[in-house]
């Protein structure tokens, strides 16, 4: 699948980066905004991360490895979804990068997903990530 197309999404959240970070790394909060995913990880560099659930009527168990952690600033991991229909080999993994930036007490949360095989695939992924970030924003802002 190796591709050069980048998917991206961003949202400004009315909360400090520390609260947004908690939402990115707390399995209970992740379940609330990530389509009901059950997440297993300690979110330490080199650790495995697994996402299990159901999306659009299909069960999935996605997985990857945490590549880089800068608390309250950056979370980067690999990601593979068997629902892609691709073989589970490194060249079919995406790298997902969350970047948090303090903007006057709020947080600009940006997400990028690399290795999309086409412009259409990148656009579809961007739309899904945008939906997820909007849900994350609602979870964080409602937990004041």
Q: How would you describe each model-predicted region?
A:
Residues 1-38:
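Hydrophobic ligand-binding cavity/cleft-lining segments
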Residues 4-10, 48, 61, 74, ...:
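Intrinsic-disorder/low-complexity, polar/charged segments enriched in Ser/Thr/Lys/Arg/Asp/Glu/Gln
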Residues 20-21, 30, 49-51, 66, ...:
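Hydrophobic pocket/interface hotspot
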Residues 25-26, 71, 141-142:
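Residues at helix-coil transition
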Residues 35, 54, 80, 112:
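Surface loops and adjacent helix of pleckstrin homology
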Residues 39-42, 59-104, 114:
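Hydrophobic-ligand binding "helix-grip"
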Residues 108, 114-144:
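A conserved amphipathic terminal alpha-helix motif
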């Amino acid at each position: 699948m190796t591709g050069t197309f980048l998917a991206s999404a961003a949202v400004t959240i009315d909360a400090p980066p520390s609260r947004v970070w908690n939402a990115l790394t707390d399995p209970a909060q992740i379940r609330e905004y990530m389509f009901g995913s059950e997440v297993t990880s300690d979110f330490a560099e080199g650790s495995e991360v697994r996402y299990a659930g159901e999306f659009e009527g299909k069960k999935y168990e996605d997985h990857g490895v945490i590549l880089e952690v800068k608390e309250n600033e950056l979370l980067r991991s690999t990601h593979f979804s068997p629902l892609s229909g691709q073989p589970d080999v490194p060249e079919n993994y995406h790298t997902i990068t969350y970047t948090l930036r303090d903007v006057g007490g709020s947080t600009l949360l940006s997400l990028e997903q690399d290795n999309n095989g086409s412009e259409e695939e990148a656009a579809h992924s961007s739309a899904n990530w945008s939906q997820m970030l909007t849900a994350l924003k609602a979870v964080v802002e409602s937990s004041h």
